[in-house]
Every structure is written in C-alpha cells, then in structure tokens.
C-alpha cells in the first residue's frame, strides 16, 4: 500500500528560498565575472549543484507498506525496514519532535531527513517531509525511525494488519 508524503509549508518555503539563493549566487557570479580564466564560478556552481542534487536524491518521496517491509521511496537508494524487525509503531503528537536537534542531515530542503536527537525520543533517523504527522517505527535492535505520511492513521493501520 502506498502512502503519499507531501512537504509542509516550512519545507516548501525553505526549498524555494534555497533554490532562489543558489540561482542568484551562480547566475550572479557568471554575470559579474568576465574573466574566463577564473575557476571560482565553476567551484561555486559545482558546490551548489552537488548540495542541491544530493538533497533531492535522498529526499523521502513517499512510503510503501508491503507484507514484508516498509519502504521509504527516494529518487536514489530506497530505504527498506523489515516488518519482522518492528517492535513498536506509534503515531506521535507533533510536539514530540519540537525540541529535536539535527545531528547530521537536512532540515528543510526537500524535507527533513538524517540523524536527529531529542530528550523525548533519543536518537532517531528521520525520513520526513513534514513535522505535523509523525509516526515512530522502533525496531527490535533499538533503531528509531520517524516517517511522516500524509495519512498517519492509515499508515499505522496498514502496519497493524
């Protein structure tokens, strides 16, 4: 069963702002620097495109629940979480994510994904596109994942079936 994952307003605004800033920086450098021998615009362009491309490639695009696993669909390298390894699945109140600190990952450009920590949940791995529909998946090995389908109740129900 497929579950959509759309961006919240904060992620949309941040994605648009980063896109505009990168376009202005890259376009502005090429417009202002007439010296073709300088490599600075090339380095900046490559850096901006790498950041943007990697953020897009690893963003969560949706979720699929099968009989064997939960799949986090991404443009590059899907994430597979075996259902047999799940100890706990719970719909969380959004406030449980409010004090989270990003340890390594992305905090708004195409979503929220990577390693996060907070006092309520401890260390977690997020594959989220919004912060108002969190679902916690905890494995028997103690790994904790935060997913944010548009329909968290249906998602939890599909995993309970």
Predicted regions mapped to residue ranges:
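N-terminal membrane-targeting/pre-transmembrane regions
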Residues: 1-36, 136-144
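Hydrophobic/basic alpha-helical segments enriched in Actinobacteria
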Residues: 3, 82, 91-94, 150-152, ...
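Hydrophobic alpha-helical transmembrane segments
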Residues: 35-46
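Conserved beta-hairpin
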Residues: 49-90
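Non-transmembrane, membrane-adjacent beta-strand/coil modules in membrane-associated proteins
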Residues: 73-141
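Terminal membrane-proximal soluble interaction domains of membrane-associated proteins
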Residues: 131-157, 161
């Amino acid at each position: 069963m497929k579950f959509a994952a759309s961006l919240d307003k904060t992620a949309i605004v941040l994605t648009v702002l980063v896109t505009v800033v990168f376009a202005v920086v890259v376009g502005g450098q090429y417009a202002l620097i007439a010296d073709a021998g300088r490599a600075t615009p090339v380095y900046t362009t490559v850096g901006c495109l790498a950041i943007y491309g990697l953020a897009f490639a690893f963003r969560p695009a949706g979720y699929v629940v099968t009989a064997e696993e939960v799949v986090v669909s991404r443009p590059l390298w899907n994430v597979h979480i075996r259902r047999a390894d799940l100890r706990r699945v719970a719909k969380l109140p959004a406030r449980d994510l409010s004090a989270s600190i990003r340890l390594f990952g992305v905090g708004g450009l195409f979503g929220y994904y990577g390693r996060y920590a907070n006092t309520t949940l401890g260390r977690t791995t997020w594959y989220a596109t919004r912060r108002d529909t969190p679902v916690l998946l905890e494995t028997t090995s103690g790994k904790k994942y935060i997913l944010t389908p548009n329909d968290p109740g249906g998602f939890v129900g599909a995993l309970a079936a």
